Amino acid sequence: MNELLLQGLSELGLDVSRAETLERFSSLLLEKNEVMNLTAITEPDAVAQLHLLDSAALLPFVDLTGKTVVDVGTGAGFPGMPLRILKDDFDLTLLDSLGKRVNWLQEVCDELQLKRVACVHARAEEFAMQHREQFDIATSRAVAQLSILSELCLPLIKVGGQFIAMKSVDTEDEIAAAKSAIKTLGGHIVKVEDYTIPTSDVVHRLVIVQKVSPTPRAYPRAFAKIKKAPL
């Protein structure tokens, strides 16, 4: 058993009995990474810290119980998969635009017998048009600039729900530049919280956005327009 993982879960006050399943997920990730580009982090201790514990560090800041959660641009399943392994009392949608990643995530969910998970192959802006304001919480980690990410995520969230962006700490300018977009899309930044990944000295940042009003029907735009002219 990975000692860093056990220590980190303990520091976060989380159920250490889930460490075995998290470690199995890590093994499946590194095994598949040999034939598919899933992660540049390939050392087990680094995976434990920079993927598993980084994702788990979200839990003290948000109550997922009974919620509908969408992980936008989930990639290899972060933060969504560790959140699901650690907590099984919410509904999770893992959303990614690359079909082979989504297929692999479904295989992992089956292998680990994870319930209440939907693995969806779709572009976020197209998915948002079909599932407008249907989720309580949207998460996203290191996917895009916050102004772009807000247009992909906020349309998915119900009024009263939250969008949580996981960022690096050097994002003051990025956050300031995104405030107008967030307001236009019906959101309001309620907290910017820095946290240290357990067992490491790496500091990351959460940007927590509350959905305070419906997103105008004009959004999200086609991704080419979002990228060319961010709000």
What is each residue range found by the language model?
Residues 87, 157-159:
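Helix-to-beta-strand junctions that scaffold the AdoMet/dcAdoMet cofactor pocket
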Residues 31, 35, 47-66:
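Conserved alpha-helix/loop element of class I SAM-dependent methyltransferases that forms part
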Residues 176-231:
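SAM/dcSAM-binding transferase cores
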